[in-house]
Amino acid sequence: MEPAAAATVQRLPELGREDRASAPAAAAAAAAAAAAAAAALAAAAGGGRSPEPALTPAAPSGGNGSGSGAREEAPGEAPPGPLPGRAGGAGRRRRRGAPQPIAGGAAPVPGAGGGANSLLLRRGRLKRNLSAAAAAASSSSSSSAAAASHSPGAAGLPASCSASASLCTRSLDRKTLLLKHRQTLQLQPSDRDWVRHQLQRGCVHVFDRHMASTYLRPVLCTLDTTAGEVAARLLQLGHKGGGVVKVLGQGPGAAAAREPAEPPPEAGPRLAPPEPRDSEVPPARSAPGAFGGPPRAPPADLPLPVGGPGGWSRRASPAPSDSSPGEPFVGGPVSSPRAPRPVVSDTESFSLSPSAESVSDRLDPYSSGGGSSSSSEELEADAASAPTGVPGQPRRPGHPAQPLPLPQTASSPQPQQKAPRAIDSPGGAVREGSCEEKAAAAVAPGGLQSTPGRSGVTAEKAPPPPPPPTLYVQLHGETTRRLEAEEKPLQIQNDYLFQLGFGELWRVQEEGMDSEIGCLIRFYAGKPHSTGSSERIQLSGMYNVRKGKMQLPVNRWTRRQVILCGTCLIVSSVKDSLTGKMHVLPLIGGKVEEVKKHQHCLAFSSSGPQSQTYYICFDTFTEYLRWLRQVSKVASQRISSVDLSCCSLEHLPANLFYSQDLTHLNLKQNFLRQNPSLPAARGLNELQRFTKLKSLNLSNNHLGDFPLAVCSIPTLAELNVSCNALRSVPAAVGVMHNLQTFLLDGNFLQSLPAELENMKQLSYLGLSFNEFTDIPEVLEKLTAVDKLCMSGNCVETLRLQALRKMPHIKHVDLRLNVIRKLIADEVDFLQHVTQLDLRDNKLGDLDAMIFNNIEVLHCERNQLVTLDICGYFLKALYASSNELVQLDVYPVPNYLSYMDVSRNRLENVPEWVCESRKLEVLDIGHNQICELPARLFCNSSLRKLLAGHNQLARLPERLERTSVEVLDVQHNQLLELPPNLLMKADSLRFLNASANKLESLPPATLSEETNSILQELYLTNNSLTDKCVPLLTGHPHLKILHMAYNRLQSFPASKMAKLEELEEIDLSGNKLKAIPTTIMNCRRMHTVIAHSNCIEVFPEVMQLPEIKCVDLSCNELSEVTLPENLPPKLQELDLTGNPRLVLDHKTLELLNNIRCFKIDQPSTGDASGAPAVWSHGYTEASGVKNKLCVAALSVNNFCDNREALYGVFDGDRNVEVPYLLQCTMSDILAEELQKTKNEEEYMVNTFIVMQRKLGTAGQKLGGAAVLCHIKHDPVDPGGSFTLTSANVGKCQTVLCRNGKPLPLSRSYIMSCEEELKRIKQHKAIITEDGKVNGVTESTRILGYTFLHPSVVPRPHVQSVLLTPQDEFFILGSKGLWDSLSVEEAVEAVRNVPDALAAAKKLCTLAQSYGCHDSISAVVVQLSVTEDSFCCCELSAGGAVPPPSPGIFPPSVNMVIKDRPSDGLGVPSSSSGMASEISSELSTSEMSSEVGSTASDEPPPGALSENSPAYPSEQRCMLHPICLSNSFQRQLSSATFSSAFSDNGLDSDDEEPIEGVFTNGSRVEVEVDIHCSRAKEKEKQQHLLQVPAEASDEGIVISANEDEPGLPRKADFSAVGTIGRRRANGSVAPQERSHNVIEVATDAPLRKPGGYFAAPAQPDPDDQFIIPPELEEEVKEIMKHHQEQQQQQQPPPPPQLQPQLPRHYQLDQLPDYYDTPL
């Protein structure tokens, strides 16, 4: 009978709130059954026989607990507001006294009603009325955590475990969590205006567990509002819906905040911060954040609260939400002696949209790491929470609460009951026991014993009064800290945002009003479930389970609830989840094995002679891996070891002391502190009870003072108290005689006590990242310590005398100090020091001869010019990144095996290097070495020689046999390799000779047989020809071949056939017309890269079985030949940059199945035109394990076609962060541009807001980013373009100006002195590889929020004005700039005309130079001229210039829409797609002679010296000024329609015109644009006075020129336009020559079919050609003709000359441009 009743109770939460209210009889029956079952099971559990379930009866209706979603209405109490998502009638007032079920449990009723069957029969009918929106009010997910104390639990599990089982499952499944409906109270404009009125105000978002469903409630407060005031206010509201809450507090600034504030005059966003008053000083950025500052004493211990005197109780008066709207509420709890009474008021207007899902829910859908959950539904009753009853609601006596036994785990051998809820006198409140921390699976013994009685529960002893309520704060999804009552939440939030990088308080204020901030900083009203639960549920879900042996056919697979709790596996015995008996399988000492016969199946077995086995089959491979990894860790644990790290502990959990035999205890990253107010059972003083403890980890807590209790543990051998803000070490530590490892890193220590000398067994003492200025003298007595670890301190002078007194010290680590010199007081040698680490100091020279036994020396990244070392026992020398010109080692180091002296200024290899007989690795790269000694190659032990980036002109001519396996001689000046190099170096496996001047290769053998084992050959960027290809066949084992950017014209098929083991080939940047078909013999080939060639036929690469990547971009492919089935491993195919390529629908459909398929988008009439001022190309390449961890962003028409945005993002080893940045960052920048126009401000804010947008992905992962924004300022009188670059990490931007690189980015790493100082202040640990906490080298990067505040997202920002001297700029990822210098990158792409080909070249060069990471490169070519700024005046009256250059017209329609009525649209030439109107925008003519093109010769100077210097003015692209030495060919495929032509001719009647292609309805014009560019403005001449030089064909003159004497009418409405627009849309007059290309004042009319009205085309016979011999005479006639025109033009009025000088120039412009070709 009990299971049936329990099953009935379990089904109750599935009903909607309205449905349950309509079935009181059924609910009563279920409640009666539940009560009977609970009594029986509780009696069984009380005997302690087995951990079977004990069900708790429902709470009294008068006081449903903190999780109850339904309640009764008190007399005179206003009904709760309609909550979103409720079923119909959810806001309806219920009659008083109506029984109501509790979420997750049964509703108590006075008497038993009908049976449970009636409810089951109606279940199907009632279920139809449920909707997804009702989840907040009816489903168990909305109140399971809050109703944990009322709902029936499972066997051996507390109620909260039962309630959160489904939550824990959902937290591992994003798709399920994204379907959750969690409402968020939205801020209204009036609320935001109230906050913006004063800088002292703000908003914090609090997850409020007191509401019927957990909401993210906005709380408006001031900087003086305390956490206690906010918590008290939320507690008073309780289950009432309410809206946005105002809590003004009692501070000095609260009085001003209470004054009614008139709304600001502007309704839109503020573009500038308001001027703060004197009292409104922004908080200091260095102020301690939520976790900073000295540790404060927490409140008294968290006792189990009960009602009674001194306890917190509810007022019987109406709650503040019951008062009339707008009426301020002044009040608080009646018995609140500790918390001040806040002045609070509810905002009148608030929104509860049923469909309004929290933004943080969308971006932060699943719980974060560190054991903390981001779900607001997983909140548990806090120990400091107030009474769970509702104000003014009567209590119904009776129904005592029963305790819940807990499952027995390895750390909790004895189950213990929770403290019961106590019910005081009528009208009192119902109290609930607090939950223990995540530390255990049971509660401490000695809890209160409850006795059922008529009037409730009688406590044997009166508990102490509970502490006042307060808030919890969580940073970046990790541990959660309890705020003290006097702490100020808004101040904590502001300090955190200032540390991120926001610079203004008003901007911090705006950011705080965004609910998405929860992934960075989050407040809770009540302790989050995962940090306050008494069990440790790690994984759970519903899976197919089978018990016993797999061979037995009796045991079948059944669907069961499975939970990994602590160190036990819990499996339910019935289908209804946790209602039946729970089977507990201890995993410590057990094993987990994979079951190969079943997919995604694991076998879990316990240890011992009576071990049991459970087979669990998971649904997905992801779940399978998650369970395998987690359970494997649990099974490998020891019983004597406890790990309670990252559990948000403020004191020691009571159940920790069950086992006194612990040997290893890990308590790192909690909030433990020295607090004398804590009782003895909870403080750190109780650590001495562990008499067998050997290892104790207390790092990253808030100790503040050294815990003296640990000194009383005699067996302690390892103690870690790092990062605890310790300022001194007490003398009592001297009694720990057995201590061997003592870690004190990351504190504020300046000295050590002398008593440390008593630690005779101490062998390791960590003193790194403290504040020592010298070596402590006490180390002289610690004779067992052999390593001095003092990195990251403040040592300026190293006194060797101190080391001389420590003969036991062998390893000295003094990196990251500020050592400038070494002082040797005596001549004696320091014979005991064998390893010396002086990296990242400020040494100018180093004489290490005194260390005559030195074996390993680290001195990288100093300022060394000379270095002297004793070589007797030297084994490894690391001296890179200095300024060495001299390196002496004496005597010859016979034991030296590794030597790195790269990135110095050495001009030759020291002679002693050739005599080091055991040298294996020599790195001399990035020096100034001109020659390598021949004896170096004779060293029989040398295996790896890195000599790249030097000035080598040749290698030793005749080499003897050498043992070198890796030879890198890239970036030198080699003209050839030694002829016998490849024959003598029979051990050579790797050769990189890229970036030299090689024209030939040495042979590998002189016969047909070869001994070559060469596997990798890199010859990129040389001058190799086809003659070198046959020599490659001498290397039959070749696997990787890079011969990009050479002079290859063919690759013989017979030679390719012999390279059968080839796996990767790169032949890009040559002149190949085909890839040989014999490539099919290379059956192992997986990568073929051949972009930037002349390949016309698609190679047979699709026949290769292992092919993964094919890059044939920037070729001349016209078709693609594919097999019926694509290769199974093909992942990437790049066919961009093939303009002749045409793919049919079937081929496209087949290729779209490839994971990464790239092809040019077809140009359409409505396609967006590419910029006339800039064009771009980008590429990406996979790195290690074929993972593409980079992404590129390119927006040509950013912000309404007036700007451009480009970006590169690098995730290092993760894929998720770069893609998030790519998809989100442009939208954020567009929003920030609406708030401020300052380049640095909107760029900085964009990066910081992106940190928030990363959500939980950015909590543990990160990525570098660079963003470039091109902006045109219409207000600027110069009309210039501004390029703004912002970067974090190692992604960088470089601008090419006048052929020279101009870096616009900066990498913030440990070599930056200011960054290193900041990192040291935050006491972060920098590992030996230069990474913050071993994670990242960059101190400014997006993501990695768990490293805050050491790592921040504030970028480096730099802005430059673009000039005509700016050619292009490059954006690159880390892999690109690690392989190429900025000078080489600029030089490599400067002569590449196509941006896509330029980006491809950079990527190929980086890969050939040794980069193995993912690479992304974006090349943006610029064409910024004086005429690009569009500052033309539109009328003689001084009209305002157009708002923007409008250089991105995606179509003619948009040009018409955006153009002023009296102005002109600005043209655009397409980069990658054709522009519809580019033929109208040309500023030159096309020759009518057959086969003739525009002359490439620059035009001569002007014929008239008196002509005005028009080019001095800035003009738009439609009104160009041709300067000298500039030629640009622009291919236009403009489409027109001849339907509206009025020339009286049919298309068939016209003679064909060369250069103009037409089919009667389309006209394609090929245009040659001459636009000159002068370096000196005074030498510039106007286009009309610059006729072209005579060509061989002669000069073309229009036959219908206007008569010289006819005056011309100036048209200011269309300045520079040739003729008037006709009704049919044509522009040029009919009598003009067809080679005159005009500019339309208005775009041609568009037909419905999508074509344009074509202008009339004159016949070629209307013009004549002047022979070359008459050119000079014609020039004189033209000159005379033009002079007469200028004389006839009247000058402007005198009064307009000084004010409108540019108008005068515009008046002189002719009506058309006719440049004779």
Curated annotation (Swiss-Prot):
<dbReference type="GO" id="GO:0043408">
    <property type="term" value="P:regulation of MAPK cascade"/>
</dbReference>
<dbReference type="InterPro" id="IPR036457">
    <property type="entry name" value="PPM-type-like_dom_sf"/>
</dbReference>
<comment type="function">
    <text>Protein phosphatase involved in regulation of Akt and PKC signaling. Mediates dephosphorylation in the C-terminal domain hydrophobic motif of members of the AGC Ser/Thr protein kinase family; specifically acts on 'Ser-473' of AKT2 and AKT3, 'Ser-660' of PRKCB and 'Ser-657' of PRKCA. Isoform 2 seems to have a major role in regulating Akt signaling in hippocampal neurons. Akt regulates the balance between cell survival and apoptosis through a cascade that primarily alters the function of transcription factors that regulate pro- and antiapoptotic genes.</text>
</comment>
<keyword id="KW-0479">Metal-binding</keyword>
<dbReference type="GO" id="GO:0035556">
    <property type="term" value="P:intracellular signal transduction"/>
</dbReference>
<dbReference type="InterPro" id="IPR001611">
    <property type="entry name" value="Leu-rich_rpt"/>
</dbReference>
<keyword id="KW-0464">Manganese</keyword>
<keyword id="KW-1003">Cell membrane</keyword>
<feature type="modified residue" description="Phosphoserine">
    <location>
        <position position="412"/>
    </location>
</feature>
<dbReference type="GO" id="GO:0005634">
    <property type="term" value="C:nucleus"/>
</dbReference>
<feature type="short sequence motif" description="PDZ-binding; required for interaction with NHERF1">
    <location>
        <begin position="1715"/>
        <end position="1717"/>
    </location>
</feature>
<dbReference type="InterPro" id="IPR001849">
    <property type="entry name" value="PH_domain"/>
</dbReference>
<feature type="repeat" description="LRR 7">
    <location>
        <begin position="784"/>
        <end position="804"/>
    </location>
</feature>
<feature type="repeat" description="LRR 18">
    <location>
        <begin position="1061"/>
        <end position="1082"/>
    </location>
</feature>
<dbReference type="GO" id="GO:0046328">
    <property type="term" value="P:regulation of JNK cascade"/>
</dbReference>
<dbReference type="GO" id="GO:0009649">
    <property type="term" value="P:entrainment of circadian clock"/>
</dbReference>
<feature type="repeat" description="LRR 2">
    <location>
        <begin position="661"/>
        <end position="682"/>
    </location>
</feature>
<feature type="region of interest" description="Disordered">
    <location>
        <begin position="1458"/>
        <end position="1510"/>
    </location>
</feature>
<protein>
    <recommendedName>
        <fullName>PH domain leucine-rich repeat-containing protein phosphatase 1</fullName>
        <ecNumber>3.1.3.16</ecNumber>
    </recommendedName>
</protein>
<feature type="repeat" description="LRR 10">
    <location>
        <begin position="873"/>
        <end position="894"/>
    </location>
</feature>
<keyword id="KW-0963">Cytoplasm</keyword>
<feature type="compositionally biased region" description="Polar residues">
    <location>
        <begin position="346"/>
        <end position="358"/>
    </location>
</feature>
<feature type="repeat" description="LRR 19">
    <location>
        <begin position="1084"/>
        <end position="1105"/>
    </location>
</feature>
<dbReference type="Pfam" id="PF00169">
    <property type="entry name" value="PH"/>
</dbReference>
<dbReference type="Pfam" id="PF13516">
    <property type="entry name" value="LRR_6"/>
</dbReference>
<keyword id="KW-0597">Phosphoprotein</keyword>
<feature type="repeat" description="LRR 6">
    <location>
        <begin position="761"/>
        <end position="783"/>
    </location>
</feature>
<feature type="compositionally biased region" description="Polar residues">
    <location>
        <begin position="408"/>
        <end position="417"/>
    </location>
</feature>
<keyword id="KW-0043">Tumor suppressor</keyword>
<feature type="region of interest" description="Disordered">
    <location>
        <begin position="41"/>
        <end position="118"/>
    </location>
</feature>
<feature type="repeat" description="LRR 13">
    <location>
        <begin position="941"/>
        <end position="962"/>
    </location>
</feature>
<keyword id="KW-0433">Leucine-rich repeat</keyword>
<feature type="repeat" description="LRR 15">
    <location>
        <begin position="987"/>
        <end position="1008"/>
    </location>
</feature>
<feature type="region of interest" description="Interaction with NHERF1">
    <location>
        <begin position="1076"/>
        <end position="1205"/>
    </location>
</feature>
<feature type="compositionally biased region" description="Low complexity">
    <location>
        <begin position="1468"/>
        <end position="1489"/>
    </location>
</feature>
<dbReference type="Pfam" id="PF23010">
    <property type="entry name" value="RA_3"/>
</dbReference>
<feature type="region of interest" description="Disordered">
    <location>
        <begin position="136"/>
        <end position="156"/>
    </location>
</feature>
<feature type="domain" description="PH">
    <location>
        <begin position="536"/>
        <end position="636"/>
    </location>
</feature>
<dbReference type="GO" id="GO:1900744">
    <property type="term" value="P:regulation of p38MAPK cascade"/>
</dbReference>
<comment type="subunit">
    <text>Interacts with the nucleotide free form of K-Ras (KRAS) via its LRR repeats. Interacts with AKT2, AKT3, PRKCB isoform beta-II, STK4, RPS6KB1, RAF1. Isoform 1 (predominantly) and isoform 2 interact with BRAP. Interacts with FKBP5; FKBP5 acts as a scaffold for PHLPP1 and Akt. Interacts with SCRIB; SCRIB acts as a scaffold for PHLPP1 and Akt. Interacts with NHERF1; NHERF1 scaffolds a heterotrimeric complex with PTEN at the plasma membrane. Interacts with WDR48 and USP12.</text>
</comment>
<feature type="modified residue" description="N-acetylmethionine">
    <location>
        <position position="1"/>
    </location>
</feature>
<feature type="repeat" description="LRR 1">
    <location>
        <begin position="638"/>
        <end position="659"/>
    </location>
</feature>
